[in-house]
């Protein structure tokens, strides 16, 4: 792993973290759009073992780049970003996808939400949204949303959203404990945060379909994984909510 660049970060300084794997075709435009909407923020691209020119394109666009020696997945890349944020003293971190799905115009909303939250999840499912997910994946997402919302005692309508912000408590937690498996950066991290008592809210955001490339998993595989994740979360939630009498029986 490359050495992480060091520097002095003023209090409340925000870090925009962009995990990227073979996103040379879109990373420069994503970095430029983030710079346009949040010129005060630092941008860190975690180059996740790319075999194309992702790192070079990100550097030319003005981002700081940390290159991992091989592909570890979004969870591993974001763990690196949280470690960087913790070490450099950032008070806020926003995860943005490298494929152009997330609209940097919503960065302000996600950062402002940290005033009364530890994590703010950007949801694409709101009345003004034109984003559509159908079929088995949508059914699995609905079930997962209900399970996480029950555990959270507050609505999480878009649990697989990777467009989210994290405050100081979440940065400290995720620098130590962050799942690296598929969707660990979304579903798994929320489950961990809920169990640790972090305050999670959501905010409406705009999301688009990928600019270039294709998803790493197909819709059916994702639906099956989400269904399994829902069962695991429900089992964890039921265990955590047992009374001492029930545990003794």
Enumerate the language-model features and the residues they cover:
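Acceptor/aglycone-binding surface of glycosyltransferases and processive sugar-polymer synthases
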Residues: 68-87, 104-183, 209-227, 242-249
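Terminal low-complexity segments of carbohydrate-biosynthetic enzymes
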Residues: 2-6, 12-13, 169, 228-249
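A conserved acidic beta->alpha catalytic loop
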Residues: 47-55, 100
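Catalytic donor-sugar/metal-binding loop of nucleotide-sugar-dependent glycosyltransferases
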Residues: 155, 178-181, 190-208
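N-proximal low-complexity "stem/linker" segments adjacent to membrane-targeting elements
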Residues: 1-33
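Short, acidic, metal-binding catalytic loop of nucleotide-sugar glycosyltransferases
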Residues: 32-41
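Donor nucleotide-sugar binding loop of glycosyltransferases
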Residues: 23-26, 50, 103
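Short beta-strand-to-loop acidic/aromatic patch adjacent to the donor-nucleotide binding site
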Residues: 90-101
């Amino acid at each position: 792993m490359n050495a992480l660049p060091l520097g002095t970060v003023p209090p409340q300084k925000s870090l925009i973290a962009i995990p990227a794997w073979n996103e040379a075709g879109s990373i420069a435009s994503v970095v430029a759009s983030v710079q346009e909407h949040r010129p005060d923020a630092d941008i860190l691209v975690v180059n996740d073992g790319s075999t194309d020119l992702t790192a070079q394109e990100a550097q030319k666009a003005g981002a700081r780049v940390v290159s991992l020696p091989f592909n570890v997945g979004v969870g591993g890349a974001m763990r690196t970003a949280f470690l960087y944020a913790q070490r450099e003293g950032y008070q806020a971190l926003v995860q943005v996808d490298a494929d152009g799905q997330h609209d940097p115009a919503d960065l302000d909303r996600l950062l402002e939400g940290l005033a009364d939250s530890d994590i703010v999840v950007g949801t694409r499912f709101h009345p003004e949204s034109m984003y559509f997910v159908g079929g088995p994946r949508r059914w699995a997402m609905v079930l997962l949303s209900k399970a996480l919302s029950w555990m959270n005692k507050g609505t999480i309508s878009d649990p697989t959203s990777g467009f989210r912000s994290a405050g100081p408590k979440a940065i400290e937690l995720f620098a130590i404990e962050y799942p690296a498996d598929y969707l660990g950066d979304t579903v798994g991290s929320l489950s961990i945060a809920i169990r640790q008592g972090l305050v999670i809210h959501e905010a409406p955001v705009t999301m688009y379909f990928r600019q270039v490339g294709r998803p790493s998993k197909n819709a059916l595989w994702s639906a099956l994984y989400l269904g399994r994740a829902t069962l695991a979360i429900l089992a964890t939630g039921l265990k955590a909510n047992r009374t001492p009498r029930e545990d003794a029986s």
